[in-house]
């Protein structure tokens, strides 16, 4: 499909720079693709009223790490070249893939020292060697530390990797360390938040429990590749980024039991959906799963296991707007987004939410 079919105009003032407070006070646009789309303006706290006892919410419990690193490249006696790196995938205890800016300043064998911007590494200096250069500014780094020691050092010197559309307008701060994290995050490794989950609070969970709604957790470590623009003119020519995740055997079995009883699988966020669909067989049976997924969902995809999707509002021509268009219909989503813009919904990671029913 032509990528420009997924384009739309978004006013700059529609982009949220801070989340709603409290988290569960955000708005929620309910979208039912029944012929002419049925759109309903509600709030996140209304979510339980759209679910039935025995339905299951699926959450991504990945935890965002401060993966934005500011460093200085040194090559021989040249130690004056600043570089910015966003870690996006761990490939070994001491090795990470990262996006570098400006990547042209780096080559294999260069050393980078981190923690010179006012943040001190408690374990001493944090350094890495550039092992490889890839496409689109990607590099592979081998750090001098490994495992938990490296994790502690990154925590000390790193910054929360805010999405580009926020970072271009303001610097990260201490509030973001809490705001850009779900209340149920536990598996460290993401460099972007599963943002639909940011709306959940203990109050909302209590209401869901009262309604007999089940909840389960899977893990997909969201990478910085989620923000990469689609540069191809046709979706068939786009190469999707990969992310690491897993669905454990107990969770897979319980989700299958929900489906067998007639309950619906409701994914909180596109990351949960992509992982569940990666784990699902053709018949919808959800299998235990672990590894890297590069699933790219566009209109025409047949959803195997997911019945409903709660998700924030996405960028024009992004792979995530393509995904929601596959789920609820391209015309439906264009109508929904036009309504959201006209009625003042807040967009993107810190913005409002939508609840989508799957198109038959």
From Swiss-Prot:
Alphabetical list of SUPFAM superfamilies matching this protein: QueA-like
Pathway noted in the entry: tRNA modification; tRNA-queuosine biosynthesis
Keyword Chloroplast attached: no
E.C. designation(s): 2.4.99.17
Gene3D superfamilies linked to this entry: QueA-like
Domain of life: Bacteria
One Pfam family cited in the UniProt record for this chain: Queuosine_synth
Keywords, ordered alphabetically: Cytoplasm, Queuosine biosynthesis, S-adenosyl-L-methionine, Transferase
Keyword Cell wall biogenesis/degradation (UniProt): no
GO biological process: queuosine biosynthetic process; tRNA wobble guanine modification
Catalytic activity of the protein: 7-aminomethyl-7-carbaguanosine(34) in tRNA + S-adenosyl-L-methionine = epoxyqueuosine(34) in tRNA + adenine + L-methionine + 2 H(+)
GO cellular component term of the entry, any: cytoplasm
Compartment(s) where it occurs, according to its Swiss-Prot or TrEMBL record: Cytoplasm
EC class (word): transferase
Alphabetized InterPro entries for the sequence: QueA, QueA_dom1, QueA_dom2, QueA_sf
Molecular function via GO: S-adenosylmethionine:tRNA ribosyltransferase-isomerase activity
Subunit text: Monomer.
Family matches, as HAMAP family: QueA
Family: Belongs to the QueA family.
Function statement: Transfers and isomerizes the ribose moiety from AdoMet to the 7-aminomethyl group of 7-deazaguanine (preQ1-tRNA) to give epoxyqueuosine (oQ-tRNA).
Protein name: S-adenosylmethionine:tRNA ribosyltransferase-isomerase
Gene field: queA
